[in-house]
């Protein structure tokens, strides 16, 4: 699933080299943490969250087949925020 999320997100963004997916496995649930470049955050989320919802729907469908639950968490990169804040001063 990690590779699926990476492939889909890399095709959506302007900075595919900054797409990082971390997989955290639990007993029945797997959390996929997605990090993208700050400027690509809107592309991954989409208007009214439609793109993110579509990715989560694909994960849910694939998870049914594997009898696992997959949660996608889109993480804002802290280092991008810090560099942006330091540039504003």
Language model features: what each stretch is:
Residues 1-41, 53-89:
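RNA-contacting regions in translation and RNA-metabolism proteins
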